[in-house]
Amino acid sequence: MSASPSRSPESKPAGNTPPIDVDVENEQNVDAEEAVQPPTPGAGGDDADADDNDAKPAVDNEIDNDNTNLNENEGQNELNEDNLGDSDDESILSEVDEAQFEDFDPENVDIEDRPQLDIDEENLKLIGRHKRKRTEEEGTSKRKKEGRRRKSRRYAEEEEGGSDREAGGKRRKSKKAELEEDEETLDPATRRRRALDRAMDEALKKPTKRRARKQDGIDLEQMADAEIEDMRKRMTHAAQMDAINRREGKPAMHKLKMLPEVVSLLNRNQYVNSLVDPEINLLEAVKFFLEPLDDGSLPAYNIQRDLMTALGKLPINKETLIASGIGKVVVFYTRSKRPEPGIKRMAERLLAEWTRPILQRSDDYSKRVYQEAEFDPTYVLSPFLLKITSRVKSVQDSAAEARARELLPPRLANRARAEISHTSYTVVPKPTVVQESKFARPLGASGEDRFRKMRARQIAATKGQGARR
């Protein structure tokens, strides 16, 4: 697409203008480069400017016809400049005067002559570790003195505060004061947000404090003992009030109301030693809560369940059991048929845990000792003895057995059944296995060796795959 050239009536081509059709493209490239690069001083004179002015009218037609090529060249130049990432306008070398380097002679540069070193093992060891030797003219450079180190904020504030109080000098405004002044000009929402941020920062920076026996002059152990003693008195009074209400036919609700407080106190880990202390004897009040009332009725199921669970977490010893008497109540729950099965199992578990250290028994079943007895085959009745004993039975016994057999539900007669007994065996027969020598391999040793070899192969295969990767 070529646009018609627009000329002013005053512009006329010069008569003596030489033909420049061949060099139009070169001049266009030169003009594009001159548009990007700044002019070099001293490169041309007034004659060159005059020649350019004379050549402009004659070149107008060609330039207008080739505007498309020029735009394409300029776009390509811009892409090249973008790729290079360094324009001539921002370059430092664009401001350098080239005229001052006209008389530069590289042969006359003063370079220090140094003797050439031979390359050997000793010189190679010095590479990267030696220091440049200074000449006498350079002298020794003075080492920079280290400036005054900045103090930490906390020590600086303490020192400034102490010096101000002693000398009465002017205090320097801190950043906190500036922030307070700035916050006065803020809106309420921003102030609330900043206050919340400060509170969260203080909570995160606050170190965790270790629990001490004394805090602000108050003995924490003495305070815990006083709290437990007060709870013991209240529990005893509640048990007495429930017994009175039960005799009068009123509902007994005092122990149920106090149950959450009692369970909360028994579950506090920091009071464990005080809870099982025989002198305070809190477990005696727990016994009053668990024992049956005067009419033989058991306490509420919630009281039994929660207190049994809490007792299982306490380290109760022999002295505590003797002082409190709670072991008698637990034995009653194990032998009575009225408690729920779950409560009964909990009582049996407590009784086993409390009596094991007293009887010096271990809770490890592998170390449990069983009574052993030898098997005597002479006590087994022979068929002849069985016939004699069967004749001795009375007729009434045989009739009763026949009637009981007839009343049984129908079943297959040819089916082998194992008798279910509700008893447990306390005597263990002595083993009759032949004792082998200690050097003999036990049964199943070959299978273990085979499994061990397979495992070793798997491990080796996995390591080989990991090394290949």
Swiss-Prot record:
Metal-binding is among the record's keywords: no
Q: List, as start-end ranges, the regions of compositional bias called Low complexity.
A: 66-78
Q: Does the keyword Transcription apply?
A: yes
> Where is this chain's protein located in or outside the cell?
Nucleus
Q: Which UniProt keywords apply?
A: Nucleus, Transcription, Transcription regulation
Q: Where is the composition biased (Acidic residues)?
A: 22-34, 79-110
Q: Where is the composition biased (Basic residues)?
A: 142-153
Q: Which family does it belong to?
A: Belongs to the IWS1 family.
Biological function: Transcription factor involved in RNA polymerase II transcription regulation. May function in both SPT15/TBP post-recruitment and recruitment steps of transcription.
Q: Where is this region: Disordered?
A: 1-193, 444-469
Stretches assigned to the TFIIS N-terminal domain: 284-361
SUPFAM superfamilies reported for this sequence: Conserved domain common to transcription factors TFIIS, elongin A, CRSP70 (SSF47676)
- Protein name per the record: Transcription factor iws1
Lineage: superkingdom:
Eukaryota
Q: Which GO terms describe its cellular component?
A: nucleus
Entry's InterPro entries? RNAPII_TF_IWS1, TFIIS/LEDGF_dom_sf, TFIIS_N
Which Pfam families does the record match to this protein? Med26
Sorted alphabetically, the Gene Ontology BP terms of this entry are: poly(A)+ mRNA export from nucleus
Native source species: Emericella nidulans (strain FGSC A4 / ATCC 38163 / CBS 112.46 / NRRL 194 / M139)
